[in-house]
Amino acid sequence: MARRRFVVCYDIASPARWRQVYRIMQGHGEWIQLSVFLCDLDDVERIRLESLLAEVIHHRDDSVCFADLGQVERDAVKVVFMGKSRRLPNPGPAIF
């Protein structure tokens, strides 16, 4: 199953829910900036992550965005940092 790279960003109205979302995201990707993670996920991992987040967020007040950057193996997927850079996820298999 092909792994795809996603930028996942979120806007959570409650600080308590924000912390819950942050903890969930820590298990699925690399923290890039406040409320922004870079995640390499296959379809099963993405659906699982979406399900976990759906249980925590308030759908009327909060927002989570998954931006699909394409297959991890593609050379065309580039992430460029200005200023302090962050470590990108390892494109290999993830073991949880």
What residue spans do the PLM features occupy?
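Intrinsically disordered, low-complexity boundary segments flanking structured domains
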Residues: 23-24, 50-55, 80-82
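C-terminal structural segments of small proteins and small subunits
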Residues: 57-96
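Extended, hydrophobic alpha-helical segments
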Residues: 1-45
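Short, intrinsically disordered low-complexity segments
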Residues: 36-63, 69-70
